[in-house]
Amino acid sequence: LEKAEKIWSEMEFSRVMSVDDDWMRQFFQGEQKLGDILAELGRVFRDGGVDAAPLRKLIHENVDEEKIRGCGKEFFIVTFSLTDMKELELSVSDIPEGRLEDFLLACAYLVGFKNEPMGDGKRDIDGGIFNNVPADVLVEKGYTDLIEIRIYGPGREPRVSLPEDGEMYQIGPRVKLGSIIEFDR
């Protein structure tokens, strides 16, 4: 927990993507001119999208795949394969050894990010665009009592039918958190 708090308290845009922190702060505070925004967007798209290499480094330095696989807890992610044009609902046991970092990074790829192929040559993006609250995945796996932590980001939210003996608890913010790539709120 302390490590996560330290990462969050030191979070800057540039620790997640190759951008200028001051420019990004000015953008989110509405201080950038439209012409400057359009010029920056043009540059980013000419370069193939926003580079997430800093996030890959952050994941590599802080995620211990062996500990995650050996912790005795189930761990699920949802990505969307751009290569195969389908949603992937994966448990950690479905992910080949040594590839968890790739899939965690894919969970952070949004439209507009430079999407580097994963180890198998395929390209995935965050599954939240198609299933923002994948509680249905857990119900399909047999879970009956769920705690859903919400951030109210963009994306589709499929309806979930819990079993009769199931309960869903939702935890969500009372205030708007800002953009999903805004870190100083």
Predicted stretch roles:
Residues E2-R185:
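Patatin-like phospholipase
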